Amino acid sequence: HRWNQKTVFYEEASKVPFIMSYNNGKQLKSEVFVQSGIDVLPTICDFAGIPIPATSKGKSLASAFTQINQVPNRDYIVVSDQLSQGAPVNGQQLNPEGRMLRNKQFKYWIYNYGTQTEVLYDIVNDPGEMVNLINDPNYTTALKNCRAQLFSWATEYKDPFIKYLVN
């Protein structure tokens, strides 16, 4: 996509493998499932046998690696992005921030700044994320569902970005 940074929501930058090594004398397994960075701390705490902080928003994934048929089932994940810029551009300090929701078929993202703040991709039929469907009337229901899921997530996790979301 010719972006000069890795803080974007395209698959090449946001679909990062989560690799964990844990040696407790048991044979662990390899699993493919969707997880979020907010799950790392609770997972490490769980493996270490220490309490998960009450302020942690994630969920432990330890059982996915140690028990049979315990892979977490999520309808979607949310990824956040905050671009930090050093020098002002035309006298204005820009620090765009965004959220991305990815479910089984669609990827929706929204930024608080820019000329195209919302994007919707059908990642099943357009895995290269080349056609923005945000204004396509055939995808109105998908867009509403993605917006509602992201709003629900932001409400649950008390995300201050909620003020930019469309519901």
Task: Describe each PLM feature range.
Residues 41, 130, 150:
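Generic structural marker for isolated residues within well-ordered, non-membrane alpha-helices
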Residues 9, 18, 30, 60-63, ...:
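Conserved beta-strand positions that form and line the central face of beta-propeller blades
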Residues 26, 39-41, 46-119, 153, ...:
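C-terminal cap/loop subdomain of S1 sulfatases and analogous C-terminal strand-loop tails that border
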Residues 126:
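Intrinsically disordered, low-complexity polar regions and short flexible loop motifs
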Residues 5, 25-35, 47-53, 87-88, ...:
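Active-site rim elements
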Residues 1-29, 35-36:
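Histidine-centered active-site microenvironments of extracellular/periplasmic hydrolases
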Residues 15, 133-167:
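Long, internal low-complexity/basic segments
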